[in-house]
Amino acid sequence: DYSCANGFCPSFVTVVGGQLKKPSAGIDSGTADKVETLFDPLPEPTLPTLDRPWNTVVTGVGGTGVLTVTALVAMAAHVEGKGCATMNQTGLAQKFGAVVSHVRVGRDQEDIRAVRIPAGEADLLLGADLVVTTTYEAMGKVARGRTHAVVNEAEVPTAAFILDPDARFPTAAMKDRVETEVGSDGCHFIDATHIATALLGDSIASN
């Protein structure tokens, strides 16, 4: 109903005649190397047999496409004739609050007995935000030797930076926690925000 654009949501503004700003210098060599590696020809994956449901936890913040990622996976499973169940824990996270989504894919719908992923049974952790990824809700679902984690390592300021301008982002400590819970062999960290901004002019495409 466009109520947010009419002033109901203070975070909404209307830009008339604006265009996305793209870096004038293009992609730096470091980013170019990362992009080249990411888009190298990939081997076909070994798909799970789905003797048990395949469980994915997606973490991020509101308004950045986390629920869209969840919906895309669910629709892909539906198109392939598989069973699927999703649960999105959003709370009040309309804009930049924590979001944790559960996606379960099974051979048949009857194979999925519950929507919520049990503790320690996540097969994949997609971390769109490092802070939310290290929360109890997300870390409680992973298991060393079972879970693979792909996490965006970009530093996104939290409310702590409003209260303390000198606050430091504990990137190393949070990455260490993910590696401790999942195992270093199962962790992959990329600066998806930087790559998306360099390629498309907007970090919203990082997810």
Model region roles, listed by residue range:
Residues 5, 10-207:
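Active-site cofactor/cluster-binding pocket
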